[in-house]
């Protein structure tokens, strides 16, 4: 698998984890966020290694957006 395909796989996984935050039980939300963040970081790394700087930039923006959503809507849920 080439790095760009790997980046796409990690991105899909990250988006699934992000979507799962909305359906998760309160005590599971942070785990979903942690998984989403991990998968986005791996996608960004794979994109960079493949020379996909535009893809890496897009993924970084998406990660920041998902983090902002977590901070505003989910932080403290289940604590």
Regions found by a protein language model. Give the residues of each.
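Extended, non-membrane alpha-helical segments enriched in charged/polar residues
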Residues: 19, 38-45, 61
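Alpha-helical linker/edge segments of TPR/alpha-solenoid repeat scaffolds
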Residues: 7, 61-79
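Short, charged, amphipathic alpha-helical segments
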Residues: 29-38, 53-64
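Amphipathic alpha-helical repeat scaffolds of TPR domains
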Residues: 2-23, 64-65
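Short amphipathic alpha-helical heptad-repeat segments
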Residues: 3-13, 29-41
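Extended rod-forming repeat segments used as scaffolds/tethers
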Residues: 12, 16-18, 42, 57, ...
């Amino acid at each position: 698998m080439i790095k760009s395909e790997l980046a796409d796989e990690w991105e899909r996984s990250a988006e699934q984890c992000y979507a799962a935050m909305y359906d998760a039980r309160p005590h599971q939300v942070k785990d979903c966020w942690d998984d989403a963040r991990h998968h986005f970081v791996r996608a960004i790394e794979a994109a960079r290694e493949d020379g996909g700087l535009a893809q890496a930039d897009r993924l970084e923006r998406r990660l920041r957006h998902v983090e902002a959503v977590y901070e505003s809507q989910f932080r403290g849920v289940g604590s």
